[in-house]
């Protein structure tokens, strides 16, 4: 996909870098696969802020994505590739031989007109979904299930991929982009290849307003606050933190481990920061 630097006709356009995909569908999404999506503004049911820096932004409709890929043995033709405002990856509209249509995460290199297949008998080709027990070791995969039949939960963002390192018994070892090596049951499904739109990270929004369009509000530095609002706050004039950098609630902000899910600790062979000392 070509990367376009916008002509600097104004200060807000000067730094804009766009990733242009001429193959994207320019019309509306498939109506049967679209649902209403309510914006929370980062608030919970009590109206309290639970996630900071959320609010505003353009209204979105949610596209129903098939993360299970459970229509085995039925060929599906890629009708079109679409933009999805809810994720960094593009999505592909599949039309199955029985007439049903479903959205999937668009894999890298899959074009309009390609025929994809799901199931244990599917060939090893980008976009095909198989149980991990049927995928050769060394294959690059994405959209990986964490529990058989639950649907893909890992490796779904633009340009993401994982490497199938080994299989032993009922578990397979996957190396994720973060460096983490994780065990996954061999009956979990994964899609062959990488996620498309891999140049997403090269774009530049160019101005603060473009971030606001995405529903992201400004982040205020702790040192600019009062001491009642943040541990870094207060002082006369411009001052530093005066301590180890922390969150507004006192949690160390630099390199502190926050993983608390002990139930799945035994599924992690090597943690992502094992080489950081």
From Swiss-Prot:
GO terms for molecular function: rRNA binding; structural constituent of ribosome; transferase activity. Signal peptide: none annotated. Residues 37-59, 221-265 are annotated as: Disordered. Residues 50-59 have a biased composition (Basic residues). GO terms for cellular component: large ribosomal subunit. PROSITE patterns: RIBOSOMAL_L2. Pfam families: Ribosomal_L2 (PF00181), Ribosomal_L2_C (PF03947). Keywords: Ribonucleoprotein, Ribosomal protein, RNA-binding, rRNA-binding. It comes from the Bacteria. GO terms for biological process: cytoplasmic translation. Transmembrane segments: none annotated. Residues 229-241 have a biased composition (Basic and acidic residues). InterPro entries: NA-bd_OB-fold (IPR012340), Rib_uL2_dom2 (IPR014722), Ribosomal_uL2 (IPR002171), Ribosomal_uL2_bac/org-type (IPR005880), Ribosomal_uL2_C (IPR022669), Ribosomal_uL2_CS (IPR022671), Ribosomal_uL2_dom3 (IPR014726), Ribosomal_uL2_RNA-bd_dom (IPR022666). The keyword rRNA-binding applies. The keyword Ribonucleoprotein applies. NCBIfam families: rplB_bact (TIGR01171). One of the primary rRNA binding proteins. Required for association of the 30S and 50S subunits to form the 70S ribosome, for tRNA binding and peptide bond formation. It has been suggested to have peptidyltransferase activity; this is somewhat controversial. Makes several contacts with the 16S rRNA in the 70S ribosome. Part of the 50S ribosomal subunit. Forms a bridge to the 30S subunit in the 70S ribosome. Belongs to the universal ribosomal protein uL2 family. This is Large ribosomal subunit protein uL2.
């Amino acid at each position: 996909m070509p990367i376009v630097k916008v002509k600097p006709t104004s200060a807000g356009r000067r730094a804009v870098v766009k990733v242009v995909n001429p193959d994207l569908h320019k019309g509306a999404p498939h109506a049967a696969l679209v649902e209403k999506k309510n914006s929370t503004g980062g608030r919970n049911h009590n109206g309290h802020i639970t996630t900071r820096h959320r609010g505003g932004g353009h209204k979105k409709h949610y596209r129903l994505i098939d993360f299970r890929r459970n229509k085995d043995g039925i060929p599906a033709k890629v009708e079109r590739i679409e933009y999805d405002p809810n994720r960094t990856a593009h999505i592909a509209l599949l039309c199955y031989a029985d007439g049903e249509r479903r959205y999937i995460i668009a894999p890298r290199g899959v074009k309009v007109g390609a025929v994809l297949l799901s199931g244990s008998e599917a060939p090893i080709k980008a976009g095909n979904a198989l149980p991990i027990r049927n995928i050769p070791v060394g294959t690059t995969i994405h959209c990986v299930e964490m529990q058989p039949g639950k649907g893909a939960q890992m490796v779904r963002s633009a340009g993401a991929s994982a490497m199938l390192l080994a299989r032993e018994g009922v578990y397979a070892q996957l190396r994720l982009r973060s460096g983490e090596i994780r065990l996954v049951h061999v009956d979990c499904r994964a899609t062959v290849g990488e996620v498309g739109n891999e140049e997403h990270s090269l774009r530049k929004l160019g101005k603060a307003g473009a971030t606001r369009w995405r529903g992201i509000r400004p982040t205020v530095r702790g040192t600019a606050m009062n001491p009642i609002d943040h541990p870094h706050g207060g002082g006369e004039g411009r001052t530093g933190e005066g301590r180890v950098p922390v969150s507004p609630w006192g949690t160390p902000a630099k390199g502190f481990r926050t993983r608390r899910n002990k139930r799945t600790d035994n599924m992690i062979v090597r943690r992502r920061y094992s080489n950081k000392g």
